[in-house]
Amino acid sequence: MAPSFDTLSEQDLHEEEEEEIDFSDLKAQYEVKLEEGLDTFVVIDGLPVVPEESRQKLIKFLLRKLNTVGHTSEDAVFMPLNDKNMSEGYAFVEFETPEQAVAAVKQLHGTPLDKKHTLLVNKLMDIERYGREGRIDEEYKPPAIEPFKEKEHLRSWLADPNARDQFALHRGDKVGVFWNNKNNPPENVVDRAHWTQLFAQWSPKGTYLASVHPQGVQLWGGPAFSKQKQFPHPFVQLIEFSPGESYLTTWSARPIQVEEGQSILTYEEEGKNIIVWDIATGKPLRSFVSHDLTAGPAGDAEPKKKVQWPAFKWSADEKYVARMLQHQSISIYELPRMNLLGKTSVKIDGVMDFEWSPATVTREGVKQYEQLLCFWTPEIGSSPARVAMMSVPSKEIVRTRNLFNVSDVKLHWQSQGSYVCVKVDRHSKSKKSMATNLEIFRVREKGVPVEVVDSLKDTVINFAWEPNGNRFVLITTGEAVAGAAVAPKTAVSFFAPEKKGGAIGNFKLIRTIEKKNSNAIYWSPKGRFVVVATVHSQTSFDMDFWDMDFEGEKPEAEKDFAANLQLMKTIEHYGVTDIDWDPTGRYVVSSASVWTHQLENGWNMHTFAGQTLSENPTDKFKQFLWRPRPPTLLSKEEQKQVRKNLREYSKEFDEEDRYAVDIANTAVVEKRKRVLNEWVAWIRREKELLAEEKDAYGLPEEADDPKLAKDAAATTQEQGETVVEEIVEEIIEESEEVIG
């Protein structure tokens, strides 16, 4: 019979009272939230203790600080008094919105009120949540100190004796990291299934490999690629590292919903799309709602929206990060506190895009520190379009350029910040035809002069500066004919400055290659060599390998240019979608990703001169990612010395290559010898077993001879033994013939 209340003994009732069941975990899980209506309140501690008659004066002084981050009033500030009519050193403040309360905590916590007092600002519900009875142990317990564990060397791959580079391969549900072995098959470092759910991405200096999951982002590193950091951002879709790997930006289309008990994300991230993280601590610095961009002119229909990415753009030294609210402003934040520079955004009517200089530039005649930012605005009413260069942190406009009949503008900084090319697409007055001209700002020269390249007759569809150089390549195309099934041909143009003593002359056209299908430009990270290719095409797959400093004879017409152009080789890779140079500029990988099409996916390895080293068809191939290298630690003088002795080093490298080939050949010969010896040993062993069987059956050693075997059979029969002869018929061939 099942037990009931009536059948319980008195002892059972008392045992239930003595051993009370602990429901604390269930209470915490299903606790009713009482935060509604109190999320606009903050508690400010660290205030001066003043008498009642000075309280209003202190409140008015405090309001100056509070109203910089939100809106409140004297009536919304409550400062309690004790029995002696003295304030207690804290106050309760109500803001108009929860967002203002969050801003007060973020921006005012830890800021000085005066020389002797520092504000400590917390949300009221945080104090209620964490200070509730039972949440904090009244008795101090020293934290447990974990035993020291030596961390892995995050740049161990740079110590490879052969100075090899690594790359990551993403195919199917597997991601692997491999050593590049030139002509030989790559050497596996690690290969894991389900390492990432979306994509993999290296950090800019190669320290971390990022994997992206529905729960957030994880960073991996060290010789064994162990987990280094994780950043919880539900349904994250895009990530971006800062140039020095100090910060990480994550984005999701879904607003964040912070779950109860989440240890890293707080109410500040609730409803946001973007988080800026500190990689060293793994903590969020600040979160934001994303801004959409309009995809183009609206016309009669509602303009399409697209994601603004990267949402935040970093200065070269990571001291500043900026985001744009299209058509309105640029907001510049100071790191690491993520405070708005000057407490206000830069209002720019109509702003369409901006770009930081990729390097810290020293302009002629300017001694103070600055970072440069370039932006452009379209034509508004009778006002012309404008390109401007701003100095940060002063926010001073140091150069402007007015433009007319502008359809679109693209900003291209040279890698050292020496130039910024403004690619201007202009329409005719009738707006029936388009053409492009280039406005090149010479940033390091006094006054930032602008050089105009207006010799282009068609529209530029691609432009790329030489890394650490002063040459560039561009691709132009004519206007597409309405209804035409074939896209118009393209032309590839190479530009270089004129020779002008020690100075850099004007940019001049070296050569134009007509009637091409090329649409992409890939410079070697070391400059000089460039691949001009056709990617994402269904009909053309050519890759042209060019040398801008060919050591052969120079054409007479190009003797005044700081370049000697030479086509080294043209190859094809069917279905090519991506081209990637290794960090040293020695190897190029072309790949065909399943993310674009499903025909002949895989990757091919080439030298800088276009010689194909290997072809690697790979089922469900997705990504090929060279591991970046950090900047060299050698000084400019040491680098100069290395270049000077390069021929001597080359002899050593050639000797090492020959030795490696000899070792490889020796390994092949040794393997063949080993296989031959194993075969000879097997033959010997089989012969010995055969001889033992012959002895057992009384067969002579020469029984393999047919004549001797026949005589042996006759002898056996004479001795009275029975010999069974088996005849086996085997049909060799059948044919059917019809007669008559």
From Swiss-Prot:
Residues 1-10 have a biased composition (Polar residues). Keywords: Cytoplasm, Initiation factor, Protein biosynthesis, Repeat, RNA-binding, WD repeat. Pfam families: eIF2A (PF08662), RRM_1 (PF00076). The keyword Protein biosynthesis applies. It is found in: Cytoplasm. Gene3D superfamilies: 3.30.70.330, YVTN repeat-like/Quinoprotein amine dehydrogenase. WD repeats lie at residues 193-230, 232-289, 302-343, 455-496, 513-556, 571-609. InterPro entries: EIF3B, eIF3B_RRM, Nucleotide-bd_a/b_plait_sf, RBD_domain_sf, RRM_dom, TIF_beta_prop-like, WD40/YVTN_repeat-like_dom_sf. One of its GO terms (molecular function) is identical protein binding. The keyword Glycosyltransferase does not apply. GO terms for biological process: formation of cytoplasmic translation initiation complex. Residues 1-20, 695-721 are annotated as: Disordered. PROSITE patterns: RRM. One of its GO terms (cellular component) is eukaryotic translation initiation factor 3 complex, eIF3e. Belongs to the eIF-3 subunit B family. Component of the eukaryotic translation initiation factor 3 (eIF-3) complex. This is Eukaryotic translation initiation factor 3 subunit B. It comes from Neosartorya fischeri (strain ATCC 1020 / DSM 3700 / CBS 544.65 / FGSC A1164 / JCM 1740 / NRRL 181 / WB 181).
